[in-house]
């Protein structure tokens, strides 16, 4: 049985990349990211997010193929704009594909996709994916020009990059980044886009973002995997979802006290 607390209030996409990172660290078959995804669904995840990187540093092709038919919710596949990745996505046909920038030397995704600067490439990728019946999302910075370009190239969804908000060193810096995200959510809605957000969010910084009425979905992974070390996987998923829903409803979840 899949548990959903206040469905439709705000969606939680649980990213399973770092379950695969832990598996790959020792070259074992455990922990199994497929099992993690299915348990996350049972604990209240509204979708499962996974990033098939070109270097396959965590999620592998076999993970994506094995997981797709087993999910009861949605698969949100993150990938770079390369012909290889687009072809894999069109073969597997997840419900959603989020196009992201990618550099092999980065530890994690460092910024948003430059849709305005790579407009024709992004537009063609959106068309190919849409032709396969896949809903396309673009991972972008909360920038007015990028949001307008995303709408113009035919993507129905954007995911606002919250990394700078999450990594802010001072309250003033964090407040400024939060305002950019809030303004970006408003701009996205005015362009008729579904607005999601994610990157670097954890148990003590997610509340202001989750409270924004224009945000439909948050994608969170590393913080949930880290918290699960201490509380258990399903509990970590349930707690994150409860914190998000409480923030959206204007209340405070009592356990929101430590990042992990």
From Swiss-Prot:
It is an enzyme of class 2 (transferase). Keywords: Cytoplasm, Pyridoxine biosynthesis, Transferase. Gene3D superfamilies: Aldolase class I (3.20.20.70). The keyword Transmembrane helix does not apply. 3-amino-2-oxopropyl phosphate binds at residues 15, 26, 200, 221-222. GO terms for molecular function: pyridoxine 5'-phosphate synthase activity. 1-deoxy-D-xylulose 5-phosphate binds at residues 17-18, 53, 58, 108. The record marks 159 as: Transition state stabilizer. Its main location: cytoplasm. The active site is at 51 (proton acceptor), 78 (proton acceptor), 199 (proton donor). Belongs to the PNP synthase family. Catalyzes the complicated ring closure reaction between the two acyclic compounds 1-deoxy-D-xylulose-5-phosphate (DXP) and 3-amino-2-oxopropyl phosphate (1-amino-acetone-3-phosphate or AAP) to form pyridoxine 5'-phosphate (PNP) and inorganic phosphate. This is Pyridoxine 5'-phosphate synthase. It comes from Cupriavidus taiwanensis (strain DSM 17343 / BCRC 17206 / CCUG 44338 / CIP 107171 / LMG 19424 / R1) (Ralstonia taiwanensis (strain LMG 19424)). The lineage of its organism: Bacteria, Pseudomonadati, Pseudomonadota, Betaproteobacteria, Burkholderiales. The gene is pdxJ.
